[in-house]
Amino acid sequence: CLSNGISESNIDAYYKEYAVPNRFDNADTIFVKRMLQHVLPEQLRSSIAENMFKEFVGLSAAEFSKELYMSVDEVKGLVNSGMYVGSHGSRHYWLNKISPEEQEKDIKQSLNFLEDVGAPTNDWVMCYPYGAYNDATLSLLKKYDASVGITTDARVANLKADNPFELPRLDTNDFPQ
């Protein structure tokens, strides 16, 4: 980071702001996650992640992704087998950290993907990456005919009382292992 114009005092300030433990991660872990998710400039985040993959995993991020994530054909297979596939964004951005224009581009790209795999693009569901959204996100979901938005608020939804664009959910980690 130091060679990319981010000083030690910046790092210290970032640590104070972002190293806040949550229900899943300790302070150090969440600090690294936040730096690589949205705090550092995107190009620097990508470079750090790529170097970490090569050093600790022994593969490039792209090679690892091919093993970890479903292929387009596998997603099409889910849809063809009757599974519902909704949106999680195109680039997995914290939507509340990007401009409304960038949000719209990301949502449209995601809808194009859903269309390509045969998933519905009217009355569709958005599961916000990291649970992050804002008023611009909600407006865009309505503009593009979404029916539901799912947050990371950890509780059971009350479909009669909760805003359909701000539904809570339980994470798999919320259940006994």
Residue spans for each PLM region:
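Extended, charge-rich helix/loop segments that form flexible
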Residues: C1-S81
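C-terminal active-site subregion of NodB/CE4 polysaccharide deacetylases
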Residues: S9-N10, N22, S47, N80, ...
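A near-ubiquitous, low-amplitude feature marking generic local secondary-structure context
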Residues: Y15, A19, M35, G58-A61, ...
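Conserved SAM-binding loop
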Residues: M52-F53, R91-L95, D116
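Short beta-strand segments
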Residues: F53, G86-G89, W124-Y130
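Glycine-rich, flexible loop/turn motifs
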Residues: K66, R91, N163-E166
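Histidine/lysine/aspartate-rich catalytic loop segments that bind and position anionic ligands
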Residues: S71-V75, V79-E102
